[in-house]
């Protein structure tokens, strides 16, 4: 059993190094719907990958990056609010993905693996690819950390300091899109956003500084992954949703902590 769980455990711990800090920005900037839009659009990536006979997860990465770029452009060049655009894109892509899968008559598609993840099927090859992606995202995040933080805390002050706010928003969206694509096999399209927001929301109850919030979020994420895999192993439950349940449980426990005066 340990041999089966170990690659999944290692992958989850590696992913938490980027889902936690990016989740902090998602919570601060109230971007949860952006994450949902990209994750729900992943089904279209699966359908296109199968149709074009390429690895569906590669198709998901490419599609989420294209959608992130498109959303940045649409937000700046149309009169619609970002929530309206996200709603249109999310439901259009999800519906188009379902219809496209339905048209693939000669191909059997196990949607459950893509919707809720296939965590226990992760192997060391997957871990290598995910690890490379994590290094890229984490390195970029560390390099732009101060600028991203400044534009999040006080956009006006950041602009005075000469920071390009649109560029930072674009970078954050691209990093979030790549993180969601990398995490898709871990927990699936429908619940991937929970890996971003729940540990970050829990960490907010304990942190005093942005950096400490990231640290707490990483700890909460790792605890959720370990607890979820143990729950899955003992009770034969779906691994991805089990991780989310543990994460939600930690959040509920954090609500009993008294607020600082």
UniProtKB/Swiss-Prot annotation:
Keyword Iron: no
Stored InterPro entries: ABC_BtuC-like (IPR037294), ABC_TroCD (IPR001626)
Superkingdom: Bacteria
Gene Ontology, cellular component aspect: ATP-binding cassette (ABC) transporter complex; plasma membrane
Main location: membrane
UniProt entry tagged with the keyword Ribosomal protein: no
Protein topology in the membrane: Multi-pass membrane protein
GO biological process: response to zinc ion; transmembrane transport; zinc ion transport
Similarity comment: Belongs to the ABC-3 integral membrane protein family.
Stated role: Involved in the high-affinity zinc uptake transport system.
Annotated PANTHER family: ABC-TRANSPORTER METAL-BINDING PROTEIN, HIGH-AFFINITY ZINC UPTAKE SYSTEM MEMBRANE PROTEIN ZNUB
Record's protein name: High-affinity zinc uptake system membrane protein ZnuB
